UniProtKB/Swiss-Prot annotation:
Disulfide bonds join C203-C216, C318-C380. In group A rotaviruses, VP4 defines the P serotype. Some rotavirus strains are neuraminidase-sensitive and require sialic acid to attach to the cell surface. Some rotavirus strains are integrin-dependent. Some rotavirus strains depend on ganglioside for their entry into the host cell. Hsp70 also seems to be involved in the entry of some strains. Residues 389-409 are annotated as: Hydrophobic. GO terms for biological process: permeabilization of host organelle membrane involved in viral entry into host cell; virion attachment to host cell. The keyword Coiled coil applies. GO terms for cellular component: host cell endoplasmic reticulum-Golgi intermediate compartment; host cell plasma membrane; host cell rough endoplasmic reticulum; host cytoskeleton; membrane; viral outer capsid. Residues 510-776 are annotated as: Spike foot. A motif (YGL motif) lies at residues 448-450. This is Outer capsid protein VP4.
Length: 776
């Protein structure tokens, strides 16, 4: 829309596309989201890219289907199915107890007429009768002899299309599948000394625990899962199941590498983590039956323990994240028991424990890699909390439990009252446990989780045993310490100062009367327009943000807002677009003639409010005198205004930050502009919405783009403080005169204050929405 409008203009000087400027400013905006886990649990460092990241849980989960493995000879463990998956016919399995049982399994392909075949079994050539009458299915047969030189007898068979065969040693027997799919089931052979029998397997195979026998039967009858049928699965050697053990000391400090100034140290350390929860219980006023809040709070805990004969002093900070909020309301009477909000941690929550001790590992915990930890699980049980109401039996909240499982470890920084500590943050995920919690004498019962009422359950602390390891880059001289503490403290102090400034600014906005807030909302709207094309001024304002908030609170600007906006309105109404303006050919001369109309204001520039009025009048001239022959209001702001301000003796570099704060691009970012043609108004916003309507009835009419473009070049352009929807709502519910409508369309601050003083909810709500954007 913006580019189409300006294409209609005669542009023989510097031009700026409004839509491009809006997009550019919008792309530079950032939104800060603050996560506050507690004043003593701020994370100062994120995990480095070359760190270990998440640590795996130490629990070993036995797979359902382990394999495939390459053909081999081994003694299978008792109670495990060996699932054979041969590709071709022939001998697939041999096993013997070397005394009275020689056992082998043969696979016969489809459609085989009875014939004698020669196989090599246990190193000897044997003739075995082979037959398979099925046209589509394969056949496994078991052959057994009882003496080394005896003859084989056939048993089984197993007929199926999946070409799978299962065998297992268990309970003094050798189990093997027999029958016909889909009803194949395990059969068995009694064999002495079965536990010492080794098996020679001549095809790929899998291993399954006996507990998964039902799944094994399903595979025999229906086939392996699809992932096992791909040719990308490569069988491994059975030796890959072996575990290589390495002996290591419990606590180690190992030098990995060393240069002249730095060395890498690997620390393998056992730790004892003790922590406790803290809470805040706030009772409401009144008769004593209402509770306002029961919430978790960060808790510090310091303790000592012995590690390898050394007395260790440790410090932990426990905080929670992702709490669940509950409430209970027993009724509307003042004597009805009620809790407005109480917090519960459940399976969607996390517990953070920041750990530090006085050992060598934590002295230089700055440049760290290969960070890993293994911790035990702990169960946290809630205790009882009695709500002491004035009369009657006390309701009691009791029960609740969660288990904490280690979910990772990162670096962090703890800020105590005296020092900042580089520490480790252990993150724990939660699972709900029994018993559930309830509140006696209420409907609250059988809810799972750990409530904040008594999360420690009368214990002094919870304890977790574990071990962590890391590699740290430290100075070669052990007496030196990595100089990081000061910079951390400076950053923390700066954050606190900025937070205080924001709080002061927001508190100020709440203290100013509503009428002044209206004026305050109008002022940055004009400031935004003035500086929208002057990047340098905005950069100055950004760099002076904190200075602005300090000065703004103590200056006369807040008390002079009403006078200032009155002067804005006067400047706008007194301006006449004469033929002299139209005949001007250069931007500079146009500015000179326009500025001469406000010379009466320039004489007094001692106060910030007067200087602001001077700029604002020039600004309003810029907005009203939109398009002349050869220039538009963006041309004035970009090509002329900055040069004039830079040369002005009344406006210096220290005044600009006082007027244009970092909020100059945040106040009312969704701008809307309107032009008026008689009793018809055309309105277009920066987000692409547009309206056309009659002033008297506020009935919408078709929006004529060409007419809007022509009016922009030849009519005043007004910033739309009260938008079309608000005006129409006001007219439909209260009715307004034509004069009031025109004043609202012109954003006359006097008229706006009149509506506010009359407690008009529609205008008040609109202004409050704009003011909400003024908060930092």
């Amino acid at each position: 829309m913006g580019s189409f409008i300006y294409k209609q203009l005669l542009t023989n000087s510097y031009t700026v596309e409004l839509s491009d400027e809006i997009d550019a400013i919008g792309s530079e905006k950032t939104q800060n989201v603050t996560i506050n886990p507690g004043p003593f649990a701020q994370t100062g460092y994120a995990p480095v890219e070359w760190g270990a990241g998440e640590t795996n849980d130490s629990t070993t989960i036995e797979p359902v289907l382990d394999g495939p493995y390459q053909p081999t000879r081994f003694n299978p463990e008792i109670g495990y199915w060996i699932l054979l998956a041969p590709e071709t016919q022939g001998i697939v399995l041999e096993t013997t107890n070397t005394t009275n049982k020689w056992f082998a399994t043969i696979l016969i392909e489809q459609d085989v007429v009875a014939e004698s075949r020669t196989y090599t079994i246990f190193g000897k050539t044997e003739s075995i009768q082979a037959e398979n009458t099925s046209q589509t299915e394969w056949k496994f047969i078991d052959i057994i002899k009882t003496t080394q030189d005896g003859t084989y007898s056939q048993y089984g068979p197993l007929v199926l299309s999946t070409k799978l065969y299962g065998v297992m040693k268990y309970g003094g027997r050798l189990y093997a599948y027999i029958g016909h799919t889909p009803n194949a089931t395990p059969g068995h052979y009694t064999i002495a000394n079965y536990d010492t029998m080794e098996m020679s397997i001549f095809c790929e195979f899998y291993i399954m625990p006996r507990s998964q026998e039902a799944q094994c039967t399903e595979y025999i009858n229906s086939g392996l899962p699809p992932i096992q049928n791909t040719r990308n699965i490569v069988p491994l050697s059975l030796s890959s199941r072996s575990i290589k053990y390495q002996k290591a000391q419990v606590n180690e400090d190992i030098i990995i590498s060393k240069t002249s100034l730095w060395k890498e140290m690997q620390y393998n350390i056992d730790i004892i983590i003790r922590f406790k929860f803290n809470n805040s219980i706030i009772k409401s006023g009144g008769l004593g039956y209402k509770w306002l809040e029961i919430a978790f709070k960060p808790a510090n805990y310091q303790y000592n323990y012995i590690r390898d004969g050394e007395n260790i002093t440790a410090h932990t900070t426990c905080s929670v994240n992702g709490v669940n909020e509950f409430s209970y309301n027993g009724g509307s009477l003042p004597t009805d028991f009620a809790i407005s909000r109480y917090e519960v941690i459940k399976e969607n929550s996390y517990v953070y424990v920041d750990y530090w001790d006085d050992s060598q590992a934590f002295r230089n915990m700055v440049y760290v890699r290969s960070l890993a930890a293994n911790l035990n699980t702990v169960i946290c049980n809630g205790g009882d909390y009695s709500f002491q109401v004035p009369v009657g039996q006390w309701p009691v909240m009791s029960g609740g439990a969660v288990s904490l499982q280690s979910a990772g470890v990162t670096l962090s920084t703890q800020f105590t009252d005296f020092v900042s500590l580089n520490s480790l943050r252990f993150r724990f995920s939660l699972a709900v446990e029994s018993p559930p919690f309830s509140i006696t004498r209420t409907r609250v019962s059988n809810l799972y989780g750990l409530p904040a009422a008594n999360p420690n359950g009368g214990r002094d602390f919870y304890e977790i045993l574990g071990r962590f390891s890391l590699i740290s880059l430290v100075p070669s001289n052990d007496d030196y310490q990595t100089p990081i503490m000061n910079s951390v403290t400076v950053r923390q102090d700066l954050d606190r100062q900025l937070g205080e400034l924001r709080d002061e600014f927001n508190a100020l906005s709440q203290q100013i009367a509503m009428s002044q807030l209206i004026d305050l909302a109008l002022l940055p709207l004009d400031m935004f327009s003035m500086f929208s094309g002057i990047k340098g001024s905005i950069d100055v304002a950004r760099s002076m943000a904190t200075k602005v908030m300090k000065k703004f609170r103590n200056s006369k600007l807040a008390s002079s807002v009403s006078t200032l906006t009155d002067s804005l309105s006067d400047a706008a109404s007194s301006l006449s677009r004469t033929s002299t303006i139209r005949s001007i050919g250069s931007s500079a001369s146009a500015w000179t003639n326009i500025s001469s109309q406000v010379d009466d204001v320039i004489s007094s520039t001692s106060e910030i409010s007067t200087q602001t009025s001077t700029i604002s009048r020039r600004l309003r001239v810029k907005e009203i005198a939109t398009q002349t022959e050869g220039m538009n209001f963006d041309d004035i702001s970009a090509a002329v205004l900055k040069a004039k301000i830079d040369r002005s003796t009344q406006i210096d570099s220290n005044t600009l930050p006082d007027i244009v704060t970092e909020a100059s691009e945040k106040f009312i970012p969704n701008r809307a502009y309107r032009v008026m043609d008689g009793d018809e108004v055309l309105e277009a916003s920066t987000d692409g919405k547009f309206f056309a309507y009659k002033v008297e009835t506020f009935d919408e009419v078709p929006f004529d783009v060409q007419k809007f473009a022509d009016l922009v070049t030849d009519s005043p352009v007004i910033s739309a403080i009260i938008d079309f929807k608000t005006l129409k709502n006001l007219n439909d519910n209260y009715g307004i005169t034509k004069a009031q409508a025109f004043n609202l369309l012109r954003s006359d601050p006097r008229v706006l204050r009149e509506f506010i003083n009359q407690e008009n909810p529609i205008i008040r709500n609109r202004i409050e929405q704009l003011i909400l954007q003024c908060k930092l």
